[in-house]
Amino acid sequence: MVGSYAAGGGRGAAVAAVAEGKLDELRRRMGKADGDLLRIVGVGGGAWGSAFCALLQDAYGRHRDKAQVRVWRRPGRAVDRATAEHLFEVINSREDVLRRLIRRCAYLKYVEARLGDRTLYADEILRDGFCLNMVDTPLCPLKVVTNLQEAVWDADIVINGLPSTETREVFGEIGRYWKERIRPPVIISLAKGIEASIDPVPRIITPTQMISNATGVPLENILYLGGPNIASEIYNKEYANARICGADKWRKPLAKFLRQPHFIVWDNSDLITHEVMGGLKNIYAIGAGMVAALTNESATSKSVYFSLCTSEMIYITHLLAEDPEKLAGPLLADTYVTLLKGRNAWYGQKLAKGELTLEMGDSIKGKGTIQGVSAVHAFYELLSQSSLSVTHPEVKKLVAPVELCPILKTLYKILIKRELATDSILQAIRDESMYDPRERIEMSQRQCLYRPSLLGLPKVDITQA
């Protein structure tokens, strides 16, 4: 089956033995006694969260006496008739999926839904291996729980598959269920986006910070996983790599546990840069989609846009980290693939083609939340604050950081203020007065841009840093 780690003969036995060894090693590190399951819980039923949990189920689900993978998603989300019809086509195009559903006595309900005689629900189809935001890519069957307390109360590892816009609310509720816990769980966040707070001082709040604040789980137990992750491609065994970022205590053992033959996971200590880049890339992906649509997929225009937007991203990270991780490896690959393909780039294309409008909102059927929209607002508001002023390299005067980010400014005026049309993004990258993006990068490295207060850290004398 595509997406399964099952293999025949000796190779299958070898793969299973390696997986069991990694599972046993993590169980020992987490202090699990014999007979006490390692409970892995995915929170959120979006495409990447569901696919990630399905990867773990494929890898470790066979060891039922040692590990359990389950997913929480909200109940009550109905599958519309058009999606049900398409899902039926997908099922019948895949013999392995068709046989599995017949064997599980689950096929008939999809026939009835196609005919309009039955309503399917998102949690119901996820149990059968279908994510509502990714029905073209069948997953393995998953254990799905719709009661949040039941799902998370005894979790050892929690996978945050929620959008950043929902993370605070859901983990605030989870925090109430964990008040009596003696040992905090380990949390791996897949969320890509940030919140901005202006009062009392400008600062960003990343998903890992939201989770820690909401639950009381120490930051050393909360990690971020990012990389070039197109969910359907990774589940279908397209080769990919990723980084798990956070404190020393957990990132190395988790990198080893998560690594699969086609999904290579490295570890990195720079949590902030990776989380911030995870939010920034969604912003610039919307613009990339617009450029692609408006230029008839011009490779030259897209490459010009890529060079300009990555220089803005590098500049912004120097405000948030004293020595930010270089835009290379999985960090660069994540940016590239998101600008090339993904829901945010898709959204930008549809806006530029007139097939979607801003009035339709940023939650799109079959795609989920377009996180780049809220990220545009957050970063623009944050970087507009005069208290963060930097020296303009040409006029030698203090300006708000956003004044050195013309693409971010343009996207804000298109998406949030709605003052400009989508073709304004082309004017932003074709401005004759624009300087070489290399100059922005050199300026960020030359000037002391780091503002620890943006992370809620005490102010330091950066001239002596």
UniProtKB/Swiss-Prot annotation:
GO terms for biological process: carbohydrate metabolic process; glycerol-3-phosphate catabolic process; glycerol-3-phosphate metabolic process. It is found in: Cytoplasm, Cytosol. Its EC number is 1.1.1.8. Transmembrane segments: none annotated. It catalyses: sn-glycerol 3-phosphate + NAD(+) = dihydroxyacetone phosphate + NADH + H(+). One of its GO terms (molecular function) is NAD binding. InterPro entries: 6-PGluconate_DH-like_C_sf, 6PGD_dom2, G3P_DH_NAD-dep, G3P_DH_NAD-dep_C, G3P_DH_NAD-dep_N, NAD(P)-bd_dom_sf. Keywords: Cytoplasm, NAD, Oxidoreductase. May be involved in cell redox homeostasis. NAD(+) binds at residues 44-49, 192, 231, 343, 371. The active site is at residue 281. GO terms for cellular component: cytosol. The lineage of its organism: Eukaryota, Viridiplantae, Streptophyta, Embryophyta, Tracheophyta. Belongs to the NAD-dependent glycerol-3-phosphate dehydrogenase family. This is Probable glycerol-3-phosphate dehydrogenase [NAD(+)] 3, cytosolic. Substrate binds at residues 192, 343-344.
